[in-house]
Amino acid sequence: MDTSATSPDGTQPEMSPAVAAALASADGISDWISKHHPGKVMETRNHRLAAPYFAVCLEYRQAALLLISQNMRASAFALWRPTYENYMRGHWALNVAGDNDFQKIAKTKAVPKFDTVIKALDGKSGMFAKTKAKLWSPMSDFAHGGINLLARWSGPDGIGSNHPDGEVLDLVVRLNAYGLLASMGINYMAGEHGLSESIFVEKVSAVLSGIKALP
């Protein structure tokens, strides 16, 4: 079995112009997020729970983009799920978590399961379970060695990273959306010192206009 299709560290030798352009655009979004990151948020229990989730989402996004820039695509895709999950948990903590949730967290010293979070969010909008159902299987495969990951590391030329550029471009779009949404949550918690939600909605809509379906 030929394993020469990839270098020992799992990287690919070249980056396409399309991926390079997407990363440049993502860097611009990162700079914008950083520029509009409020220094403080209002102190409430919901904000205290939500803020770390949003912050971790932003860090994972940056890490995934860095990995893509180094052509370490499998590692970048492994961060897709936790980036998404931390944003969703932050959204739940900010907008849905109530007295019973905080009492359970204090009693059990554990946060709710992700399915519980999604169900609680669906009580408000009804769309989150459908999104999770569509994305969870490939997300989990890439994070935990499932069939989608194996299919991109085994081919006619041997064993090596073979994540198509199109999938990488879609991942960058998703990462940008999660980052902007997390930043929107942080700005909301800053009250009058944060940017208005409408500004973020416009930017997220512009980002998502180019998205394609991942497998």
Regions inferred by a protein language model and the residue ranges of each:
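Short runs of predominantly hydrophobic/aromatic residues within well-ordered alpha helices
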Residues: A50, A76, W80, K132-W136
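Short, contiguous, well-structured surface segments enriched in hydrophobic/aromatic residues
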Residues: G28-L67
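Long, charged low-complexity segments
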Residues: M1-T44, N100-P215
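Active-site oxyanion-binding pockets that recognize sulfate/phosphate
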Residues: H47, R73, D165
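Short, hydrophobic, well-ordered secondary-structure elements
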Residues: F54-N95
